[in-house]
């Protein structure tokens, strides 16, 4: 039996004046799946998340959320919760009071059951110790966690989150990752955007990459990372000049200029661009020549390299 869809979008188009924010976008998210949405600034991620939350309506295409077609009206679909940009909070209220106000707006239980639910989501977000602190003093990471707590109030079947790890320290990030993983295991569909590839690698089974409003990749994360493409590698050896000579003479190896994302100035490091077989041959030659290899590491992860290649191709047309 097929797993039901949390989101099924076909040919979604959205305009802002003459600007095409989304251009025939397809998206499939099943229940129990954490689906990553990634792209450069202005790619259309926030617009798409807003459509899922009922904050905007599409100008074209078909959108089904939790099996129900979405009408062309501004309304949050039943069973959906989350936030885009940043959670809206009342700074003069405590975390608990913010959640109580939101619960009242949503018509949730105001009695003991409602208070217990607020306690539960505060604990789930790791905010019990600051539940009675005013949110004006909250850090960005604490505000993000309170936004997550607010989204969980209604026990949504689809959770839509914009940069949920933004501002979190490593411990806070691990906590949020555990919460999202548990929710997915319990059958909740999760769509999240992130600029951090480590978030996607830690959480997502599938990912959709947007560039200039179009889908340039959608599918399993491991398929994206496994695609055979040249990567930049940082190579440090006991004899940099010998390593450079061997690299220049090895087929399939290009010596990079040592500038760009993830590259640090290191006079002893050689940055080479290659497919894995050519890199293996270079390392073998270096070792045979008696030179010690001290470090060999990709400058960026295979996933980030794939993201950069796909989005740059779409934006430049090359």
What is the predicted function of each stretch?
Residues 3, 274-318:
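C-terminal coupling/interaction segments
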Residues 4-7, 14-211:
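ABC transporter nucleotide-binding domains
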Residues 13, 70, 77, 96, ...:
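Alpha-helix N-cap/helix-start and coil->helix boundary motif
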Residues 81, 85, 192, 235, ...:
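Small/polar loops that bind or transfer phosphate-bearing groups
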Residues 177-273:
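ABC transporter nucleotide-binding domain
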